[in-house]
């Protein structure tokens, strides 16, 4: 049952994290008559611009997080980022609040150690070989055992922040310092992963709903140092490998529980499926679904958490390409005229108040009968958007 926003019978969502993904979540929730409250650590974040109201707090601070939850008394608490005090979410859940998909899922997936041990040691899923290190000396020993090249990541970070590739022993200290600079939360622990020479990597968007688990078509993507640059859908997979990928995705999402969409990242190597990571929320590579699917990942997420049926069918092949800033500018302006002239192409600007060098400020979305054509068009569109 959904009531009327701003009245006593309203269904209320409290969104923790108000970036570009959260913005689309709120837009979809608004379409279904849900009252939306956005929370982030800075003013005028993208999702705040489309919410009924917002709060600026440090979501890692237990007292601040508890205060805003108790003030708003939401029906659903929807984490959109990792930088949240998940211990407080677990406490609030025991007090009767509903955390999406569950507080335990939010806690496990913000911590690479927790989710990796769950996937590998409890569920027996194949992963890259890994070790954890809590000091530079421990890291050096771990690298020796894993081998070079290898990947170093903070156990708590997002969007590839702090991730680097060690190509020689001379890179280890630099990678350690970089990981420490980007960690979210307390501590400096990192994960050391073997370098997987995969054939390709995909995101398998997996929707857990009251009507069962559904899988979107595989999304291919390119990440540079863990940061999404482009994605496309569908990525071709043979039926047996796709079935294996769906089996892996179902195992990990069933273990996490709750309803909503999960972005399951997988490496494919010689038709073997290797688990990488999972996010219990819409995934940045899934922005392509805004033009490729009958329902975007954002609509699927909102409908799933409201107990409504979803449609994961593909409408058109398509691609996305990130628009990044090359300047530092407060309140930037965008020239999108030429990009908007390209066939079957849409530009989505996130509305971030500050442009920073390398920061994602928007995305180009293109459809075509052939994925490769869509990829070329989206890349061209993104590259001709001018940020001033």
From Swiss-Prot:
Q: Does the keyword Nucleotide-binding apply?
A: yes
GO aspect biological process, one term = 'de novo' IMP biosynthetic process
Q: Name one Pfam family in it.
A: RS_preATP-grasp-like
Q: How does it assemble?
A: Homodimer.
Top EC group: ligase
* Matches recorded under InterPro entries: ATP-grasp (IPR011761), ATP-grasp_carboxylate-amine (IPR003135), ATP_grasp_subdomain_1 (IPR013815), PreATP-grasp_dom_sf (IPR016185), PurT (IPR005862), PurT/PurK_preATP-grasp (IPR054350), PurT_C (IPR048740), Rudment_hybrid_motif (IPR011054)
Q: Name the NCBIfam families for this protein.
A: PRK09288.1, purT
Its biological purpose: Involved in the de novo purine biosynthesis. Catalyzes the transfer of formate to 5-phospho-ribosyl-glycinamide (GAR), producing 5-phospho-ribosyl-N-formylglycinamide (FGAR). Formate is provided by PurU via hydrolysis of 10-formyl-tetrahydrofolate.
Q: What is this protein called?
A: Formate-dependent phosphoribosylglycinamide formyltransferase
Gene Ontology molecular function: ATP binding; magnesium ion binding; phosphoribosylglycinamide formyltransferase 2 activity; phosphoribosylglycinamide formyltransferase activity
């Amino acid at each position: 049952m959904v009531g009327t926003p701003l009245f006593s019978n309203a269904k209320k969502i409290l969104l923790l994290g108000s970036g570009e993904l959260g913005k689309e979540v709120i837009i979809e929730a608004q379409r279904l008559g849900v009252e939306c409250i956005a929370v982030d650590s800075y003013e005028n974040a993208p999702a705040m611009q489309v919410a009924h109201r917002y709060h600026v707090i440090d979501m890692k601070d237990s007292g601040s997080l508890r205060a805003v939850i108790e003030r708003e008394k939401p029906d659903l608490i929807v984490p959109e980022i990792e930088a949240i005090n998940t211990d407080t979410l677990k406490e609030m859940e025991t007090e009767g609040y509903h955390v999406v998909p569950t507080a335990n899922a939010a806690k496990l997936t913000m911590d690479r150690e927790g989710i990796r041990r769950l996937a590998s040691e409890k569920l027996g899923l194949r992963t890259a070989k890994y070790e954890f290190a809590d000091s530079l000396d421990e890291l050096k020993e771990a690298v020796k055992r894993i081998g070079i090249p290898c990947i170093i990541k903070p156990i708590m970070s997002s969007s590839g922040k702090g991730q680097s590739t060690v190509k020689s022993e001379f890179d280890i200290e630099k990678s350690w310092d970089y990981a420490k600079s980007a960690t979210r939360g307390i501590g400096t622990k990192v994960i050391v992963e073997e370098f997987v020479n995969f054939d390709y990597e995909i995101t398998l968007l997996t929707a857990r709903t009251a009507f069962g688990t559904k899988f979107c078509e595989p999304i291919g993507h390119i990440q540079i140092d863990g940061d999404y640059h482009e994605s496309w859908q569908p990525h071709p997979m043979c039926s047996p490998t796709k079935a294996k990928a769906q089996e892996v995705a179902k195992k990990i999402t069933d273990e996490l529980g709750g309803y909503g969409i999960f972005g399951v990242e997988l490496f494919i190597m010689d038709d073997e499926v290797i688990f990488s990571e999972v996010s219990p929320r819409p995934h940045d590579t899934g922005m392509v679904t805004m033009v490729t699917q009958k329902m975007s990942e954002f609509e699927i997420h909102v409908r799933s958490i409201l107990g409504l049926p979803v449609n994961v069918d593909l409408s058109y092949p398509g691609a996305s390409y990130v628009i990044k800033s090359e300047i530092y500018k407060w309140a930037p302006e965008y020239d999108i005229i030429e990009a908007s002239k390209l066939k079957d192409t849409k530009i989505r600007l996130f509305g971030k108040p500050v442009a920073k060098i390398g920061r994602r400020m928007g995305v180009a979305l293109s459809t075509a009968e052939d994925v490769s054509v869509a990829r070329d068009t989206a890349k061209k569109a993104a590259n001709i958007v001018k940020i001033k």
